[in-house]
Amino acid sequence: MGYDVSRFQGDVDEDLICPICSGVLEEPVQAPHCEHAFCNACITQWFSQQQTCPVDRSVVTVAHLRPVPRIMRNMLSKLQITCDNAVFGCTTIVRLDNLMSHLSDCEHNPKRPVTCEQGCGLEMPKDEVPNHNCIKHLRSVVQQQQIRIGELEKTAAESKHQLSEQKRDIQLLKAYMRAIRSANPNLQNLEETIEYNEILEWVNSLQPARVTRWGGMISTPDAVLQAVIKRSLVESGCPASIVNEIIENAHERNWPQGLATLETRQMNRRYYENYVAKRIPGKQAVVVMACENQHMGEDMVLEPGLVMIFAHGVEEI
């Protein structure tokens, strides 16, 4: 529906009047053949009854409608109109194209969002403030939270039960696999080959790395840092069969003899450049896999590999 003509300052050109509602055009559209203009809502409602132009009865449908010319839109935008909230005391007169932005900030707008200043902080339409009850609102919030907590507790209990069942199934599956392997040695060899190929595929997917500051090595990473590195290993595609073992080898207590203490590391530092290292994506850390470092002595590598974490100095080659 169009704007009430009485809200506008001065005379309004008759070309800007909707023939259906007799108001000033709101969201105007035009029938292209006869060039008659209508409010979008008015003509849409009209077409629900008949498919003709309301003015000259020529055949026209919703699909035929087009936006009105720019000159007409400019004429509409320049009209001066009173605020929708004039009945509530607003005396502002604005250009039609600024009406919506004014309404959103108009202090007389009964639907303007306001925040309760009595303590609950609820945002509500201004006209609902007189009937607002903080205690009632907060009670509703608490009840909703209790319902949500109950749902989360139920979900957590179900997840815990499912996890317990899955752990039991995994143990049964492991026992079954052990029985099969013991009965068929060839199957065990095949499984080991598949696992080795999976490890090689993952290692080859990582970027070669160079360590420029071996002195920045963190040989005793805490549990939090190890968890961060482990997450990156998993995200990089590290096979599940070795990820835990590799991350355990991120601490010097599990390192081979040649890396076990600061003294031995300093003695063997000249050999570090011979390592084939791969960068753990996004981290100042490398993985040194035994399958790529068979040229190193047994006192410098671990099966299946080890992780070295640094404060800085890890670069991709």
Curated annotation (Swiss-Prot):
GO terms for molecular function: ubiquitin protein ligase activity; ubiquitin-protein transferase activity; zinc ion binding. Residues 135-175 form a coiled coil. It comes from the Eukaryota. CDD domains: mRING-HC-C3HC3D_Nrdp1. Pathway: Protein modification; protein ubiquitination. Its EC number is 2.3.2.27. It catalyses: S-ubiquitinyl-[E2 ubiquitin-conjugating enzyme]-L-cysteine + [acceptor protein]-L-lysine = [E2 ubiquitin-conjugating enzyme]-L-cysteine + N(6)-ubiquitinyl-[acceptor protein]-L-lysine. One of its GO terms (biological process) is regulation of canonical NF-kappaB signal transduction. A zinc finger (RING-type) spans 18-57. The keyword Disulfide bond does not apply. SUPFAM superfamilies: NRDP1 C-terminal domain-like (SSF160088), RING/U-box (SSF57850), TRAF domain-like (SSF49599). Keywords: Coiled coil, Metal-binding, Transferase, Ubl conjugation pathway, Zinc, Zinc-finger. It holds the Pfam family USP8_interact. The keyword RNA-binding does not apply. Acts as E3 ubiquitin-protein ligase and regulates the degradation of target proteins. This is E3 ubiquitin-protein ligase NRDP1. The lineage of its organism: Eukaryota, Metazoa, Chordata, Craniata, Vertebrata. The gene is rnf41.
